Amino acid sequence: MADQDFDAAALYDEDYLHFYAGPGIPAEHERQVGDDRSEADADLIVRLLELRPGARVLDLACGHGRIANRLAARGHAVTGTDSSPAFLTRARADASARGVHVDYRQGDMRDLPWDGEFDAVVNWFTAYGYFDDDTNRAVLRGVARALRPGGRVILELNNLTSALRGHRPARVAVHDDGDLFADRHHLDPLTSRLHAERTVVRDGRARTFSFHVRLFAFPELRDWLHTAGFTDVSGHGEDGGPLRADHDRMVVVARRA
């Protein structure tokens, strides 16, 4: 599947916000992205990146501002970019409600306009890997360009090693209002791609679409980062400790050479 086949607007839309942001979201999603988890994520990012007050941070694929607004509340100068107008509208509204400022811009991670501008780049909650391998590699090179020398990137994504051991072929989540969110998964071990068919049922109407995302084991992503111009690559679990094979999620930190 070529990179142009990825339809971000189909995946990241108002339906996604309904099930991942706001009241009544499924319990599984609350554990993943709810307020308590989001505050812990922001603290972990600050700690692993060793961010100083006023650090210039780019939240790449910032979504509805879950991380960007919390980093701004911690005293950092944050820019958030995302391809979804709906997500950016929600992000700006949340920033206003929190009394923080984030420079939100609509954009494409394949065409980043910055050169040496940021102290850190954040890419959180499986927001990387939706294109073909050449394009995914090019995204990392663009991230390196956006960072000042010595700046750091942090990525949080699925851990392929764990996924291969405990693959879930299907999952269903139910909103408090009865709306349904269901995924059928196929993990291809030859390409390290997770192919998903998602069905969303809201107000009695069903919509089904497909997408895929590239998964990584740490050594492969480390090598990709080295090739893109990074060094000092480290792998962590969700708690910031050393990465283990049984961690479902993987946090990777690297420094621009």
Predicted regions and their residues:
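SAM-dependent methyltransferase
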Residues: 134, 154-224
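Conserved class I S-adenosyl-L-methionine
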Residues: 1-61
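C-terminal lobe and adjacent flexible extensions of AdoMet/dcAdoMet transferase-like proteins
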Residues: 218-257
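A short acidic, Gly/Pro-enriched loop at the edge of an enzyme's catalytic core
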Residues: 113-120
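A short glycine-rich, Lys/Arg-flanked "PGG" loop and its adjoining helix->strand segment in the class I
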Residues: 137-149
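Short glycine-centered segments of the SAM/dcSAM-binding site in methyltransferase folds
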Residues: 56, 150-152
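Class I SAM-dependent methyltransferase SAM/SAH-binding core
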Residues: 66-111
